């Protein structure tokens, strides 16, 4: 191990120990604020079910007679296999380990251990069961997952500006926001191209970069469709959603494929969007004309390792350098610190945009700020865990299906200096789909693979689509 690597890990140990303490304190801070501002202490993923207040709207599901974490009800449907275990088992923090040690010592000294056959249960766990039974909650066992019904209204810590809440006043509150660029003069498009953005981004990532730079020929032959994913940009941001893969796919199918009656289409996807693109290819194998994936987050999971946990530790290594890696780690591991970032930055994104324009004399376009800051913590936190981490066990089968059953061109682009998703991920995709072509762009990172080289990338995409037409 080099000195720089050792220093990064050593400093990271102390920094993340402090973040453990901060997140622990913020947990109780938000419970107090939620109670005063929303008249309810909503349970988080570091709380246990007994701490949740017994209300008629809540459903708590037992796991083999015990109790697990409380998560949110997925709107009208409950799909337990879509919920990543990284949400409620991200690994014990320093404070959690210490508190468990103290509780176990107290338990042994004052109450002893409760023996049941070959199972040893702590008295702390036994007391939890007593508290739940006294609360007279209605219990129901469903696929060993705990859920709780919650409200659809934005939380007090979310942004309530007209842009972020435009979906609440829309006539179609159950559809995603879609930006469409049609051929001019009402000419019928020869083909359709669907653009899917990545994590903490929006359709502006495509519409502000690629759309203006396509050639006149492409603009007259293709219909370009860029979508704001569920929870981002001007799309719905339901607070009662778990933002699972199934929900994201259903919304894309409803808002894009069904609405525009797409029989065939090309897909261009970035980062998180690559997972959704592959899932769409599996569901609609005959409709896909080409797949263009930018920085796909595909990690080969070793045998015997829990996929979601492995992917999380690869994406969000607890290191302080580089900065993007540190940011990903904070958002992944710390629920309450992530919410604080949302409270400080997301809730004030309009002020940040104004100051940015003021400091740059209005010479800097702020469309990236829209993507980075126009979402909710609930949406980004669940999407990160349920899609990027939770899909770790699914991508192998998706890629196998694309290789064997989806007859389309597969092109992969990756920045040579991408510090968030390593280039090896793209080569891993090629190892699963040998016909895929990998293009590593030197000196470009996770964002500048498009931003700053949009003209070149627009030409590269057009060549891919033309090649598809000629085959």
UniProtKB/Swiss-Prot annotation:
Domain called AB hydrolase-1: residue spans: 193-296
Gene3D superfamilies, sorted: alpha/beta hydrolase
A single BP term in Gene Ontology: cell wall organization
Keywords attached to this entry: Cell membrane, Cell wall, Cell wall biogenesis/degradation, Hydrolase, Lipoprotein, Membrane, Palmitate, Secreted, Signal
Keyword Manganese: no
EC number: 3.1.1.-
Principal cellular location given in the protein's record: membrane
Signal peptide segment: 1-45
Localization: Cell membrane; Secreted, Cell wall
GO CC annotation terms, alphabetical: extracellular region; plasma membrane
GO-annotated molecular function: hydrolase activity
Entry-linked InterPro entries: AB_hydrolase_1, AB_hydrolase_fold
Lipid linkage positions (N-palmitoyl cysteine): 46
Active site: 197, 271 (nucleophile), 418 (charge relay system), 446 (charge relay system)
Record's protein name: Probable lysophospholipase BODYGUARD 2
Native organism: Arabidopsis thaliana
């Amino acid at each position: 191990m080099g000195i720089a690597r050792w220093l990064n890990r050593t400093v990271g140990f102390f920094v993340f120990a402090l973040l453990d303490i901060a997140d622990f304190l913020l947990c109780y801070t938000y419970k107090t604020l939620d109670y005063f501002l929303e008249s309810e202490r909503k349970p988080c993923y570091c709380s246990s079910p007994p701490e949740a207040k017994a209300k008629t709207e809540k459903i708590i599901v037992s796991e083999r007679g015990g109790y697990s974490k409380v998560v949110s009800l997925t709107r009208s449907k409950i799909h337990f296999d879509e919920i990543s275990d990284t949400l409620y088992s991200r690994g014990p923090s320093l404070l959690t380990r210490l508190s468990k040690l103290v509780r176990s010592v107290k338990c042994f000294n004052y109450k002893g251990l409760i023996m049941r056959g070959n199972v040893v249960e702590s008295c702390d766990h036994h007391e939890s069961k007593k508290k739940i039974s006294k609360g007279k909650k209605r219990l129901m066992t469903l696929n060993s997952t705990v859920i709780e019904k919650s409200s659809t209204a934005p939380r007090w810590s979310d942004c309530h500006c007209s842009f972020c809440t435009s979906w609440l006043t829309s006539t179609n509150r159950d559809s995603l926001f879609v930006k469409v660029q049609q051929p001019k003069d009402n000419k019928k498009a020869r083909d359709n191209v669907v653009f899917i953005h990545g994590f903490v981004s929006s359709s502006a990532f495509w519409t502000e970069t690629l759309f203006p730079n396509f050639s006149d020929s492409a603009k007259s032959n293709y219909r370009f469709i860029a979508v704001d994913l569920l929870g981002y940009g001007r799309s719905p941001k339901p607070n009662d959603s778990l933002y699972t893969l199934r929900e994201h796919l259903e919304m894309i199918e409803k808002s894009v494929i069904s609405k525009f009656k797409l029989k065939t289409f090309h897909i261009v996807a970035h980062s998180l969007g690559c997972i959704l693109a592959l899932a769409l290819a599996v569901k609609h194998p005959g409709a896909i004309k080409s797949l263009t994936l930018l920085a796909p987050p595909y990690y080969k999971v070793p045998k015997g390792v829990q996929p979601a946990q492995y992917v999380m530790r690869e994406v969000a290594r607890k290191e302080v350098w580089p900065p993007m890696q540190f940011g990903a780690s904070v958002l992944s591991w710390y629920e309450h610190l992530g919410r604080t970032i949302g409270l400080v930055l997301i809730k004030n994104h309009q002020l940040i945009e104004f100051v940015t324009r003021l400091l740059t004399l209005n010479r800097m376009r702020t469309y990236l700020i829209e993507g980075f800051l126009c979402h909710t913590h609930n949406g980004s936190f669940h999407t990160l865990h349920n899609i990027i981490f939770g899909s770790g066990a699914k991508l192998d089968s998706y890629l196998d299906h694309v290789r064997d059953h989806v007859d389309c061109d597969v092109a992969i682009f990756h920045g040579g200096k991408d510090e968030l998703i390593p280039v090896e991920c793209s080569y891993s995709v090629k190892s699963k789909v040998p016909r895929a072509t990998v293009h590593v762009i030197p000196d470009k990172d996770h964002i500048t693979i498009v931003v700053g080289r949009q003209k070149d990338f627009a030409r590269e995409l057009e060549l891919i689509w033309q090649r598809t037409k000629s085959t």
